[in-house]
């Protein structure tokens, strides 16, 4: 936040929309009317998946999001999720809505723990301090965690990673060239190798 950069890649459209001058008249998407992106450079670069990951050995025998929803209702699980101000937390809230789960009631029942970002959630799962966590496929891959289920688009929408060159870039030509490179087959093969799906 408030750092200079040439290219911005977000884990959700919401954060990109808040900087997109073409949306400055849409107060829901760009509430502060910011115009920080270089026109015509925004693309939907990658898709990630929201997954349900478990620690080594899967001690609670969690099989799926359906199974997790039942365990949450019964108070028989400890789930790590992202805070509501980060994309992974926002996707998790959509999953709760899909299953008609009340997050506040679950938190009050002591079956939720929070992380301020997806890395913190991933660490809780990796260390086995929780029974499972909602994290991205790429984070599960990086941490070597077992994924027992992937959320569908119906459950939480698509996890789109938009990218754009910043208007205040000190190197706009190089930034655009880099963004173009990220869209090549060569770059996409690298992204796919760690769990992303290409959008371009």
Model features per residue range: what roles?
Residues 1-4, 12-21, 41-48, 54-200:
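Exported/periplasmic ABC-transporter solute-binding proteins
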Residues 24-36:
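Surface-exposed intrinsically disordered loops and tails
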């Amino acid at each position: 936040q408030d750092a200079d950069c040439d290219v911005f890649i977000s884990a959700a459209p919401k954060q990109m929309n808040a900087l997109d001058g073409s949306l400055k008249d849409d107060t829901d998407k760009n509430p502060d009317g910011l115009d920080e992106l270089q026109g015509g450079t925004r693309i939907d670069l990658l898709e990630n998946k929201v997954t349900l990951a478990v620690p080594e050995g899967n001690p609670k025998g969690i099989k799926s999001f359906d199974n997790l929803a039942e365990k949450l209702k019964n108070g028989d699980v400890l789930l790590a999720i992202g805070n509501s101000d980060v994309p992974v937390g926002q996707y998790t809230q959509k999953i709760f809505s899909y299953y008609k789960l009340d997050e506040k009631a679950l938190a009050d029942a002591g079956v939720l723990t929070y992380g301020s970002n997806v890395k913190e959630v991933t660490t809780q799962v990796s260390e086995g301090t929780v029974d499972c966590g909602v994290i991205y496929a790429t984070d599960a891959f990086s941490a070597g965690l077992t994924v027992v289920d992937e959320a569908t688009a119906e459950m939480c929408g698509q996890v789109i990673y938009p990218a754009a060159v910043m208007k205040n870039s000190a190197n706009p030509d190089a930034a655009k060239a880099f963004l173009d490179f990220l869209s090549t087959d060569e770059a996409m093969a690298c992204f796919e190798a760690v769990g992303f799906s290409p959008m371009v």
